[in-house]
Structures are given as C-alpha cells and as structure tokens.
Amino acid sequence: MKVSELMEALNLKLLTEEVALDGEVKGGYASDLLSNVMGQAEPDMVWVTMQGHQNIAAVASLIGLSAVIVAGDAPVAEDTLKKAELNDVVIFATEASAFEVVGKLYELGIGK
C-alpha cells in the first residue's frame, strides 16, 4: 500500500508539506519509547505514536520509515514539522487513539 492510499483509507491529516507520498507501507509499529522504535521498527513501516517533538522526525529518517502517525490529536511542534520536511519524513495527525489506528492498520492488512 502506498502512503497516499493509507492517508485516504484512514482519513489522516497531512502535517508535512512537500514530502513524497509515493512510498510503500510494508508494516507497522506502535510505541512512544524512541529507543524501542529504533531497535524494533524497520524501513518502510508506518509508526504510530503520541509523541510530537522533533526527535520523531530524526528517528523516522534514521530508520527509513514510510510515515509517522501522531494519534490522539496530540500536538506536533512546528520545529518537528520543519525537521521532517527537510528529511522528507511524512507526518500525519489523527483524532483517533493509537489503539484505533493500529486496529485500522491491521484491518487494512498492514502488519509485521
């Protein structure tokens, strides 16, 4: 599934501008502990979190994640979005809880 298709299927709000939405989503990972994400997530996964600080952009770029979904209507700092855009990291937001997002990803066939 393409990132753009995921955005449409989950009705996600795109927070980053001028980023590529044609990447593949090959799996998913959910955690708010950055070291856990760095040790367990794999390239081309989508990451579900409630973190909004700029380190999420750094971790996503380092791993090569397809996108980050910030759940629960959690705030995302402006410096996070700037850093993400510089590194072509897609960041979405949703009012849905992390639990709901993960369930929807599973229903779409996105899993490890």
Locate each region found by the language model.
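N-terminal first-folded block
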Residues: V3-M45
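Feature captures the catalytic cores and cofactor-binding loops of soluble hydro-lyases/lyases
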Residues: G23, L34-V46, M50-K112
